[in-house]
Every structure is written in C-alpha cells, then in structure tokens.
Amino acid sequence: MTPEEYLEGQVLLIDKPLKWSSFQAVNKLKYLLINKVGLPKKFKIGHAGTLDPLATGLLLICTGKFTKKISELQGQAKEYTGTFYIGATTPSYDLETEIDQTFPTEHINEVLIHETVKQFLGEIDQKPPIFSAIKKDGVRLYEHARAGESIEIESRKTTIHEFEITRIALPEIDFRVVCSKGTYIRSLAYDFGKAMNSGSHLTVLRRTKIGDYDVKNAIDITLFEESLQ
C-alpha cells in the first residue's frame, strides 16, 4: 500500500497480542508506517475501541482521513469469546489482580448456569470495574483503586444482544457474547457469579467481531511488520 492510500484512509484489522495495550499497538503501527512506508510524522492514526492488555483479538486501527470514522466504528456491536472462572473474585474482575474472595460452587449446575444467562439478555444495568479508565471527579477509577480508595461507581445501561455458554467444565465456563458499546465483560463475569450466589472472574477474553469486521480477517502485528519489508 502506498503512503497516499494510508493518508486517504484505511481501517487496519489487527489481532492484538496478549499483554499489549491498545495504545502500544497504535504506537507500533505508527512507528512502522513512518519508518517503513514513509508517512509524515504527524499523520493521523487511532483505534476504534480499547482492548484491555489481558485481552486479545480484533483492534480496528484507522489511518489518515478514516480517523473521522472512529466514533462511528466505536458504536458498533462487539462480539467476544472467553472464560469465566467460577467460585472466586478479584478486585479487577480479571487476572490483573490476585483472588480476594472464594465462594461455594457445590450448588452450581448446568441448569442454573443456563437460567442465569437469561437474566443478562437485553438491556441491563452494569457497574464498570473500579480497575477501569472511566473518570470520576476528573480522576480515572483505576487511580482511585490503586490508592486504596473506596468510591461509589454509578451503574450504566448497556445491552447484551446475545449470550451463550459454549463449554462447561467447572470451575471454568466458556462463553460468547454480542454486546453494545461500553459493555465491560469483566463486570459481566463478576455479576454472573454473583447472580448464581457465588463469585466469578474473567480469565480469558478475545474480541472476535466489531460490526461486520471479523478477527478472521485480522493480521498479527509481527506479520504486518514483515509485509512492509
């Protein structure tokens, strides 16, 4: 692809590696496009929806004039697959922090799991995790969390379009979810465990779709770099 084509606008489908932040992925591509393709240092580039470092999968990175499409792309429904670990919670609702509480699981069976799924379909109220980048009083929630401060987090409306359990091997449950913008799958994991009178946290998360864009058509950053050689 020519520099002009990148400047005119592209949506790059990247399969984000584990432990990379979305910001790191954008910076890596920016570096490659400046140094390997010859784009000007101030060209526009940005992503259309953050993925946590502990998640993998589809990251849409827009270049040039297509950065104007970012807000439109962010509004698209998103599909995720992953794993809940039942019987324990963590402060971050995922593996970023250590287990802080354990809960009974003897009462949990397939019937209860599938009945609980129904509670989360459609529009729901969801509280974001305190380990998140949302701001409260001008300060990001994770900064309050790391300072050990307790803070009241307001719930927000979000929509779960589809929610299915794809494997049950307790204490693990695999799932597939299609949801609206602003949905936290970590919060879904936490709330799901609570709804079963137990606890749960997210151990695996992969974003597979954003609107019509599919991770099957995405490229690994290393392969993208090699394609520019």
Swiss-Prot record:
Alphabetical keyword list: Isomerase, tRNA processing
Enzyme Commission (EC) number: 5.4.99.25
GO biological process: mRNA pseudouridine synthesis; tRNA pseudouridine synthesis
Residue numbers annotated as active site: D52 (nucleophile)
One Gene Ontology molecular-function label: tRNA pseudouridine(55) synthase activity
Principal EC category: isomerase
Catalytic reaction equation(s): uridine(55) in tRNA = pseudouridine(55) in tRNA
Highest taxon above the source species: Bacteria
Any Pfam family: TruB_N
UniProt record similarity statement: Belongs to the pseudouridine synthase TruB family. Type 1 subfamily.
Free-text function comment from the UniProt entry: Responsible for synthesis of pseudouridine from uracil-55 in the psi GC loop of transfer RNAs.
Name of this chain's protein: tRNA pseudouridine synthase B
Annotated source species: Flavobacterium johnsoniae (strain ATCC 17061 / DSM 2064 / JCM 8514 / BCRC 14874 / CCUG 350202 / NBRC 14942 / NCIMB 11054 / UW101) (Cytophaga johnsonae)
Gene this protein is translated from: truB
